[in-house]
Every structure is written in C-alpha cells, then in structure tokens.
C-alpha cells in the first residue's frame, strides 16, 4: 500500500513508519525537518497543509495517517486536501475525548462514568479540556499543537465526510524512549536521590488510567491503517491490563532495580505537593477489546521489556528543567514518620499486588 504519514519524526511517528516499512508498505513522510532517514519525504509545515496540496495529492496515497492533528480546523484542511486523492484517512485521537476525562478534571457535572470506557461511552460536553496555560506549556513540547486543541472536533471532521472514509484511534497515555513528557521521571528521580519510599495520596494510589508503550501503540496504528475493515471505525488503544497507580509505580521502580516501599497515605497525612489535582474517584480505564477482536491486535513488545527500555532511556535522558516543588523531601520525611497515616504498602522486591477482589497474587516488578 502507498501510505503517507503526516508528522512522522516525533515520538510516535518513527515507530509507525518502521512498522509500515517492515510490513512492506511504500511510505512517504510529510514533516517539518528531516530527523530520520526516510525512504521518501516531503518537507513542509502541516499548519499550512493546503500550500502543499499539489505534491501531496500527486502521491495518490491509499491511506493518510495524520499523527499530529490537534484541532477541527486542521482536520477540515486535511479532508479538503485529500478528498478525491486518497482512499482513507487515519487520525490519532485521544482517550481524553470521553466524558470521564472531563469528570476527572472537574469540568463535567453529574455522576461518575462507569469503567472500563468503550468506544460508545459518552464524550465530553465541554470542549478544550485543558486551560490556556496548560496548552501553552504543551506547545513548548509539541510544536504542532495549536490554540484550539481538542480531539472531539478532529473526530467529527474525520468521520463526517461522505466521500473520504476515516478511521479514528483513541490513544492512551503513551510511554517509552523519547517520551517528551517524561512520565517516569518523578519516580526515577526519587530512586536516584536515594529515597527509601515513594508516597502517594490514597486516591492517587487507587486511580487507574489507560497506558500504552510507544512501539505497541505504533503497531496498532499501522494495523488499523492497512486493514480495510477499519474504515469508518473508532478504536481505543491501550494495554489490556490496567494497574492502579500504586501498582504501576511499583512496576516502574522494580524495573529500575530499586528496593523500597510504595506507600498510600491517608489524606490528612499527605504532603501538599502530593495532593491529587482533580476528582480521582473517576477512573479512566478503557477497553481495547474492539481492536483486538476485529483486527486481531496484539502487543509485539511485552510489558517487562517495555518498562526496562523506558527506564533505561529516562535515566539517561532526564528533563532539562525540573520543578523542584514536586520533590519536597522534608515534607515526605515527615509523612514517612507518621506511620498512622500509612494505609497500604507495597515492598518492591518481595511484592504481592492486590487483585481486583482484594486477594494477593504474585507479581514480578
């Protein structure tokens, strides 16, 4: 198949390109700068996609995968450029489209959403989940993000054209080497600093959300892009087993070879910098059963390998700027000394994780 990947040189894109090329597809990458040795590339700015319409349409791609769509305006431009020239569009969306995400952030009134979320679960009624200051921060990391960032309008545009079929993939929190958000860093910094324990507010400790390793997420994208059964469909992409934050923290710490304790604290004994920002009674777990059942998706990289690769990269590539307010060790030492506030403890190295029914089961971290 002839596949055009828009934005193929960032965190996820190169892995998508690799998966497609390894499967024998003819891939062209449209991006701003050549950061990788692509077999075929077109240099340009996706913020002005229409300026490159002639070159892009001349490719006559079977599928266009847009890795960096951030607004309805961008999605509308994408559809207009490729209508009549491509056979299908594939857009990367996010699990933040669900109403549950709005409840989590305190932006949606009403009851909690039941989980796991499926592709039919209610979407947010309020657009633009993130405040302007958060968008500004994200734009410093992701240069392709525009001021109108919201994946709900993106999905409407991609799935709303009668002539050009679209596929939408709702991605999880993606981790792996090259993660510009450094999701593992707060845990690994404490380990590197010799902390005896990692502390979590009890609500944070129990909370769970969708995750995916970057190579596995890329594999799902490549699969959906090259399987005609995916036309017109929406798919959640996430690991099939979701760990609560306490267990996930222990997994990461174990992959780093750490021996210590992960402790869930009573709210009254939790330092201010560890207080949850949001309604953590609302879990964000999603089901990825549809893509597994319809397209036969399976993760090519096992969890233990994914964690080890990510830990190794993060230890070698810490962020350049660190918010030291996140690491108030004096306050954490005080909480450690208040054993009455310790509600649950996982000892990494001799670990038993509680299963969903509260029973103990062995786990390797």
Go through the PLM ranges and name each one.
Residues 3-23:
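N-terminal Rossmann NAD(P)H-binding glycine-rich loop of SDR-like oxidoreductase domains
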Residues 6, 176, 200-207, 235-242, ...:
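Glycine-rich Rossmann NAD(P)(H)-binding loop
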Residues 137-144, 152-178:
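Conserved beta-loop-beta element that borders a ligand/cofactor-binding pocket
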Residues 190-212:
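A conserved pocket-lining segment of Rossmann-fold NAD(P)-dependent short-chain dehydrogenase/reductase
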């Amino acid at each position: 198949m002839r596949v055009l990947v828009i934005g193929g040189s960032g965190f996820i894109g190169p892995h998508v390109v690799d998966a497609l090329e390894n499967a024998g597809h003819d891939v062209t990458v449209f991006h701003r700068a050549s950061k990788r040795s692509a077999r075929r590339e077109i240099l340009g700015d996706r913020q002005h996609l229409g300026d490159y319409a002639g070159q892009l349409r001349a490719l006559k791609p079977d599928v266009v995968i847009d890795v960096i769509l951030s607004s309805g305006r961008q999605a509308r431009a994408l559809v207009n450029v490729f209508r009549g020239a491509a056979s299908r569009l594939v857009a990367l969306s996010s699990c933040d489209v669900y109403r549950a995400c709005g409840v989590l952030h305190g932006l949606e009134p009403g009851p909690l959403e039941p989980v796991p979320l499926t592709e039919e679960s209610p979407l947010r009624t309020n657009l633009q989940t993130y405040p302007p200051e958060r968008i500004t921060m994200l734009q410093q990391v992701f240069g392709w993000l525009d001021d109108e960032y919201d994946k709900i309008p993106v999905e409407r545009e991609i799935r709303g054209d009668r002539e050009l079929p679209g596929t939408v993939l709702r991605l999880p929190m993606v981790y792996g080497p090259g993660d510009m958000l450094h999701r593992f860093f707060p845990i690994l910094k404490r380990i590197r600093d010799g902390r005896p324990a990692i502390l979590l507010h009890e609500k944070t400790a129990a909370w769970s959300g969708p995750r995916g390793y970057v190579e596995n997420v890329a594999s799902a994208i490549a699969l959906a892009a090259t399987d005609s059964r995916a036309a017109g469909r929406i798919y959640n992409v996430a690991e099939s087993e979701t760990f609560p934050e306490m267990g996930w923290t222990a997994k990461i710490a174990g992959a780093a070879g750490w021996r210590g304790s992960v402790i869930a604290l009573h709210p009254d004994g939790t330092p201010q910098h560890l207080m949850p920002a949001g309604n953590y009674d609302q879990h964000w777990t999603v089901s990825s059963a549809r893509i597994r059942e319809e397209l036969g998706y399976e993760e090519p990289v096992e969890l233990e390998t994914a964690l080890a690769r990510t830990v190794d990269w993060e230890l070698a590539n810490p962020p350049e700027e660190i918010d030291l307010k996140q690491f108030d060790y004096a306050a954490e030492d005080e909480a450690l000394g208040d054993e009455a506030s310790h509600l649950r403890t996982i000892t990494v190295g001799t670990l038993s994780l509680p299963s969903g029914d509260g029973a103990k089961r062995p786990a390797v971290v």
